[in-house]
């Protein structure tokens, strides 16, 4: 089956992949330890390919080392007002380097929790779909609650997720609970008995 994509999307995907490859290669060679996170982690596990940015996680204590490594590799470093990440720019694309997720500092244990996968010919830790979806659902709130963006990824990785764990870890977020009501009705997930 032939899939047609606009040249803009193909170009964006190529640029994101190149940024992912270059950042991972630099971090793997010069440290600090890292893990692929966010939508690209879901992509490794079978989700749709992201079109906006690449997410890596580094321990909060390793931010300066990660900044130095990526800057030396040719990335332009910017620090947005959010105090839980920095951005490493390469041409027109960004690698978001997260050192806290949902107000929880990233630590070495989280990085090590990722399974080792070969991603674009580079072996790296990749966060599990259970963890990534937990993080994405915990981040939902009244100003950021686009279920349509989550549904394709959830549908694609549903057999690789410990849904009981995700439900337990997101039970205090009303938007996550509402998301599960939708996915249960759509047959993507099953309500606990």
For the regions a protein language model found, what residue spans apply to each?
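Compositionally biased terminal segments of proteins
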Residues: 1-193
